[in-house]
């Protein structure tokens, strides 16, 4: 399984490295990008192999999501889903969730 945080989502690179190490013990790859990049082509590259994507408010269109053959879940690190193509998610059985407590959990 591969979890991809496509942007910093409020955690430090050190904390991301800690999660990468802990997830690896469970056979899970955790990929963290320390920069925010909204370019659709870059997002497609970052998300291509992801089973789970963690994002804040970067827009994720059906075009971008359509390039992610393994995607099963999008976790929004803040509130609101209006930047996610929910129709695409529904049609492709991708679970979307907003998690206001993700940042507390990751940074605590």
Q: Predicted regions span which residues?
A:
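N-terminal glycine-/charge-rich "phosphate-binding" loop or analogous flexible N-terminal tail
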Residues: 1-50
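Phosphate/diphosphate ligand-binding glycine-rich loop within oxidoreductases
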Residues: 51-108
